[in-house]
């Protein structure tokens, strides 16, 4: 099959058309969201007078979750105060001193990713009640992955502060977009469209049987 004919056949396939349309919605949602986020005061016109409270709440979740994981899995010595991690070690005189400080700020709250996921769900195909339920579940997944991200970055920062910025910008940040893409893919694959019902098999009793006498 020639390439143009293959492309035409692929596009004319109804399933491929749906997938292409939903993928375009993913791209449009991402572009529109980032344009609005960076060029408007999106946080204020979404949350109004509750903006600071909303960000404080989700930042506290990220900080508390990261702190719990640090206390459980990290081998570093640190002190926590006011959403900050103070990493300590003994100096030459044997006294404990802080050698690095990491603060969990509003940008670490994952609200941006949740809002992007919300816009994506609004534009995606599917029933609204299903999208509402999936948005709540997907937002929880984003929050949990963000806590894991905070923990990994905090532990990395305590071990090697000089490597932190690179991994923050080029590893940890893209991971959150991978999570959003995975949530979109699961939605499209399993929830966006109603599965076609299989044709009910005919009742065998209604079919003529070779064992029964047939009228001439």
What is the predicted role of each segment?
Residues 1-216:
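Hydrophobic N-terminal alpha-helices or hydrophobic patches in metabolic proteins across all domains
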């Amino acid at each position: 099959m020639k390439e143009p004919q293959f492309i035409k056949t692929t596009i004319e396939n109804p399933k491929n058309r749906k997938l292409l349309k939903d993928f375009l919605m993913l791209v449009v949602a991402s572009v529109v969201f980032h344009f609005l986020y960076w060029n408007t005061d999106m946080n204020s016109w979404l949350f109004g007078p509750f903006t600071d409270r909303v960000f404080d709440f989700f930042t506290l979740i990220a900080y508390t979750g990261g702190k719990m994981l640090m206390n459980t899995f990290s081998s570093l010595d640190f002190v926590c105060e006011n959403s900050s991690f103070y990493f300590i070690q003994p100096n030459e005189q044997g006294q404990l001193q802080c050698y690095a400080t990491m603060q969990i700020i509003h940008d670490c709250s994952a609200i941006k990713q949740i809002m992007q996921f919300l816009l994506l769900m609004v534009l995606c195909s599917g029933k609204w009640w299903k999208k509402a339920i999936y948005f709540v579940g997907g937002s929880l997944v984003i929050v949990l992955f963000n806590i894991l991200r905070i923990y990994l970055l905090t532990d990395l920062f305590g071990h090697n502060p000089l490597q932190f910025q690179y991994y923050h910008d080029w590893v940890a940040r893209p991971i959150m977009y991978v999570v959003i893409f995975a949530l979109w893919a699961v939605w499209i694959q399993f929830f966006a469209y109603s599965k076609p019902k299989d044709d009910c098999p005919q009742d065998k009793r209604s079919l003529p049987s070779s064992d029964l006498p047939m009228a001439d």
